[in-house]
Each structure stands twice: as C-alpha cells, then as structure tokens.
C-alpha cells in the first residue's frame, strides 16, 4: 500500500463521517417537523457506506480497499410517534386517532449517540492522516540526510 493510498483512505473516511454528521444535524433540526414538502412528518435519514474498490483492482482480483463511499442515503421506515394535541394544525381530524399528531421518528438521544460515534470516527481518521503525514515527513528527512 502506498503512502498516497493511505491519505486517500483517510480522506474518504473523513468525507463519510462529515456526511454522517450532516445527516445527524438534519435529523436533530427536524425532530419537531410535522409537515414536509412531501406532506407527512420528517423521516430520519441514515447513510449506508460500502468499501470502495477501484475497478482495476477488482479485475486483477486484488482485495485491497481504497476507502469508503456512500452507497445511498435511506429513510428510516420506523413508525412515527403519536402525540395527543387536538389544537395542532396537523392533528388527525377523524377516526380512532383523532386529535393525535404524527411526530417524526427521530430520537434525540439516539442521534446524540450517533453524533458522538461519528465524532470519534472522524478523530480516528484525522489521527491516521496525521500519522501518515508524519511518516512521509520522516521519509523526506531520511532522504535528505
């Protein structure tokens, strides 16, 4: 594995965790959004990551990974929370759930745990990047000496 490949792997990890943090921030910001442009309550969003392999490596049968990439962003299909608030403009007007409001399926505690996890993963990628940078600088010093 080349030194530049190490930089590429760390950079892809940093970009992935940044996207994950952006999605978590969106989820927290919309935790009380009862009506979106599509008409229903906000649904929690999650990123699905996969290992990145270059096409050339796959053709050669090599197993070397080259980082991580976002395969897709999915919506959490868990049910919405029902909160009784008959005066809310989005309250269900009739039926057995009359007066209830469908609230987003965002759990703030779960989002905060995910945020801490994403922060730690980001820090780990920064540490790996700094270690690779330090090795490159040492190699240059040895080459000069």
Task: Specify the residue positions occupied by each region the protein language model found.
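Amphipathic alpha-helical polymerization modules
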Residues: 1-145
